[in-house]
Structures are given as structure tokens and as C-alpha cells.
Amino acid sequence: MYRKLLAGLLGMFTLVVVNAQEKASYFKKADTFFNTYVSEGRVDYDAIVEHKNELLELLDLAKSIELETFNASDYQAFWINSYNLLVIKSVVENHPLKSPLDKAGFFDKTKHEVGGINITLNDIENKLLRANFPNEPRFHFVLVCAGLGCPPIIDKAYLPETLEMQLEQQTLKALNDPNFIRVNKNKVKISQIFEWYKGDFTKDGSLVDFINKYKSEKLPENSKVSYYAYDWTLNGTK
């Protein structure tokens, strides 16, 4: 009985160690990948097509990594990176594309094996991230859908130990970008992201309140807000 219990405990310990090693390797390799193929908010899809195995090996590593929501920073960082990597993989698999919308089911039908499950991009965003962390609107500034209308992708992986800083940094960057928040006196044009996910941004006030929380030059309280059309043009290198 004692030997069986000991064997079981050793087995569990081994699984924990292996999972931790795989997780560390995943974040390190993801960081190298983004640093290699992302520059100034653009993705070099042509180069990735030529070296596709790097991406496939990275995502193969992600297949068996399973994380729980109670470890929020690990969980969020893993799924943010995985979303962005799977978007890139989907573009590469359908190369050349002018827009992710050129491929039917890009976000809501195509399933990917990652984190021990088969899941669509929409489900990563809506079920694994937004539903599990309903008070975290900053996801919208780090999940990159391959369209130029998204806040730009960064040349680093999101890491558990730096995630809070990175979320804050990317939100500040987006909301202080005059091309993202377009101000003309008291008329303000904002991304359709704020229209589609309005509830995420207005739990503690109006859209203007949320934007002003991060914007250095505050919007007038009486701002007339409208939405400009989302740009689905592919975010590839020029």
C-alpha cells in the first residue's frame, strides 16, 4: 500500500516537473519567435512560410501544456500568446491572404489543438479569457487578429512575470495613439472594438471614462463618440 502511494506521489511530482519545464520552454521559444518575425507591429508572414517548422514545433509544444485559472498570470500569458501564434499559423496555412476574413471560418470554425483541447480562436478569446476574467478589458489590446485594425502585435511574448506591466503598457500605447483614438475637438472616433465589446469597457462608467483612465490628454466629458470602420487588411510586413 505504502509503495503504491509513494509511486503515485512520485508520478504526480514528475508530471508537475515536466509540465513546468514544458511551460518554461514554451514561453522562451515564443519570445524568440516573436522577436524574429515581428517588427514595428507587422508580421513577416513570407519568412514564416519559409521557416514554418519553427512555428509548428512551438505550437506542438503548446498542445500538452494545461493550466488552471487560479494561476491567472500563467494562464492568461499562455492563452494570449497561443491566440496570437494560432492567428499567425492560420494566415500561414492559407498564404497568401489579404485579410483573415478571406478565409471562411478563420475565427469561429477552424479548430486548433492547444492546451490539451481542440478550440477555435473565438473560443480562446471569449470562453477562456473574457469569460474567466470578466473584469479584464485589457485583453482587447493584446489579442491580435491579423488585421491592421487591431492594436499592433509586439515583438515579445507575454510572460507571467511581466504580464501586468505588458497589459498596462499596451493599453496605454493604444489609447494614446491618435490613429486609434481620433479626436477632433469634442468629436471622437474610436475603434469598433469598443462597439463590439462595449460591456467590457463600461462596467465602471462610460467609454469616455475608460479611455480617460489611460489617455494623457483627457477627452471632454461631453465628447460625441462614433466608431470608424475596422480595418481587416492583413498586418503583414510592407
What do these predicted ranges mean?
Residues 22-238:
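Interaction/scaffold regions that mediate signaling and macromolecular assembly across diverse proteins
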